[in-house]
């Protein structure tokens, strides 16, 4: 279940860069490294990779002393690519902001170089990242559709083709998929055909 959720969250333009590292860590936990000890409880479940928006929020809270509210504001700024806000927050993340009650990484024993490296990774990651609940919701849909395709392949493919009627790019791809699955595509029949794709069960399933 967690693999499905992580797979969906990783397959995005920002987190996608972490896929090789994630797979290597999953297959060989000894290869997983962390830039500082404070990251271990946050990133251990995802093999040292930032996968979810919630992890960004936890990183800035645990490493730099952000409040819950401020960590969410940073998450929003990153996702909306607000460059001025992100650069201002970099200063707070690395060096702290006494007036606003942010300790900063350096006071927590994290070097300036490592703090900036972590912040750069968070910016690259957060541009198109999902929160975990969002990825989980998509995961449920993926699980359900995989079940339907496996156990009710003809019905599933008929419904899929109906959703792409008139789409000259997608429909041929799904017709090829029917052939790969061993499902016949029948020609129109004035005595049997309907307005849309339907399933005909005879000696073998056909659409």
Which residue stretches match the model-derived regions?
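Noncatalytic, beta-rich nucleic-acid-contacting surfaces in large DNA/RNA-processing enzymes
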Residues: 1-207
């Amino acid at each position: 279940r967690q693999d499905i959720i992580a797979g969906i969250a990783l397959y995005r333009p920002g987190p996608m860069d972490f896929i090789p590292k994630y797979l290597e860590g999953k297959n060989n936990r000894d290869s997983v490294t962390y830039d500082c000890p404070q990251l271990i409880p946050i990133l251990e479940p995802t093999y040292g990779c930032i996968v979810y928006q919630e992890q960004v929020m936890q990183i800035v809270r645990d490493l730099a002393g952000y409040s819950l509210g401020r960590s969410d504001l940073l998450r929003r700024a990153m996702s909306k690519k607000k460059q001025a806000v992100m650069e201002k927050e970099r200063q707070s993340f690395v060096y702290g902001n006494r007036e606003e009650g942010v300790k900063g990484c350096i006071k927590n024993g994290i070097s300036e170089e490592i703090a900036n490296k972590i912040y750069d990774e968070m910016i690259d990651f957060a541009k198109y990242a999902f929160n975990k609940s969002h990825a989980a919701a998509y995961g449920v849909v993926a699980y359900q559709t995989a079940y339907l395709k496996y156990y009710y392949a003809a019905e599933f493919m008929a419904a899929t083709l109906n959703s792409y009627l008139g789409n000259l790019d997608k429909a041929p791809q799904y017709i090829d998929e029917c052939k790969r699955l061993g499902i016949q595509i029948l020609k129109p029949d004035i005595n049997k055909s309907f307005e849309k794709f339907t399933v005909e069960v005879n000696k073998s399933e056909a659409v």
